Amino acid sequence: MEGLEEICFEIISHSGQAKGLLMEAVTDSRAEHPDYSAIETMLKDARDGLKVAQKAHLKVLSDFAQSGQGDAVNPLYIHAEDQMMSAEIFLDLLSELITTNKKLQEIKQQL
């Protein structure tokens, strides 16, 4: 498939960027006085980056289906898909952790 390598690197790049933003957001959420507006922006940017990765992933799947090469194994594609899937899991888990940190912060302020 033509351009597969470039698409894989696009998926890897956007997924990695999303994971970095998510780690920064969760770290910031544990600060003494977290800026939840900035944290929400990081979460949005991570989601947006993942949407780009998912769109590229869908193109690869579509191209595989149309070309009949769907059973071909490409290690770079497997790595790209793994990076995207782990970023999606990060998004789900760290979003919940940030919500928990926010609730803990509210409880601390009441004490």
Residue ranges of predicted features:
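Terminal alpha-helical segments
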Residues: 1-111
